[in-house]
């Protein structure tokens, strides 16, 4: 997918540039490891998370909706969704033609809906940024190198 909105923005430009169009960016949802996949077989995929150029814009609210929809269909009684974030939702294409807090408002309303209306537990890890302003259960790490240890520690604490 492309930067700066991709085909979604191109379509908007070709069709009259409607005022306050909402999200103006293509989405890419990546599954590094499905819940049914063996961890050893997916190890190489997890390394792709750090591949330069793979990740584009941060449309966090829609990513959460997608992930919560997938996890809600799982048969397990306890559902935990761990969010790894580099700060706030940012998509220049969308923010350039909507209110500056458009994506942030959507993220907050999505989190509220998941926390209040579902049986999904949300945990957030902010890398270099405090995401506690969005998530009720959040921690901050300063370097991506800390991620593995923190994730293990946080997951372990859920079962204490």
Residue ranges of model-derived segments:
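Acidic, glycine-rich A-domain
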Residues: 1-160
């Amino acid at each position: 997918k492309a930067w700066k909105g991709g085909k979604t923005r191109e379509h908007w430009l070709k069709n009259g540039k409607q005022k306050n169009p909402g999200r103006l960016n293509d989405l890419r949802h990546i599954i590094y490891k499905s819940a049914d996949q063996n961890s050893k077989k997916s190890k190489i995929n997890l390394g792709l998370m750090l591949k330069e150029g793979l990740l584009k814009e941060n449309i966090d609210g829609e990513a959460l909706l997608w992930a919560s929809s997938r996890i809600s269909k799982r048969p397990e009684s306890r559902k935990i969704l761990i969010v790894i974030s580099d700060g706030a939702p940012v998509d220049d294409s969308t923010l350039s033609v909507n209110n500056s807090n458009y994506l942030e408002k959507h993220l907050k309303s999505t989190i509220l809906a998941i926390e209040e209306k579902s049986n999904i537990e949300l945990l957030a890890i902010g890398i270099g940024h405090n995401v506690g302003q969005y998530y009720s259960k959040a921690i901050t790490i300063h370097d991506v190198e800390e991620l593995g240890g923190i994730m293990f520690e946080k997951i372990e604490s859920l079962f204490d």
